[in-house]
Amino acid sequence: MGPRLTRVHAPIAMKSRPRPGQAAEIRFVVEANHIIDFAVDGMPAVLATPWLIWFMEHTAREAMLPHLEPTESTVGTLVDIEHLAPTPLGQIVNCRAQVLSSDGSQFLFKLEAFDEQEKIANGLHKLNVINKARFAGRVARKTKPE
């Protein structure tokens, strides 16, 4: 057996830690670039699930940004979203992310989204707080020279 490898993680400082219950919201209007790409032959133009998830994930990130040091950022590690209802072009969507818990540098969020009539999605999202320089180093090691 070879030598045992031990990873040394850069400490996560954070300005402050969000507490359970703290939340953030993002509102957006469903535009043409947000709709499903198969809205043809009688299929109505509605908000595509990948776009909905993008906005919901960014809502959790917005909740974290005030707590981060300039050397820190976040990366998503889990997305578990149930898309419950269609939302047509032009509707306003309100996304909400609420901190449920934290464990070290990992934060768990409850996510919800509502259009002008009803709840359209809910789920969970995990974010990790990372050191930007260390993360960039990991990416650089995977990048192939051109």
Q: Whereabouts are the PLM-identified features?
A:
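Catalytic strand-loop segment that frames the active site of acyl-thioester-processing enzymes
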Residues: 13-48
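A generic structural signal for short beta-strands and their flanking turns/coil linkers
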Residues: 22-26, 75-79, 89-95, 105-107, ...
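Hydrophobic beta-strand-centered segment that forms part of the acyl-chain substrate-binding groove
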Residues: 60-94
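HotDog/MaoC-like acyl-thioester-processing domains
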Residues: 88-89, 98-146
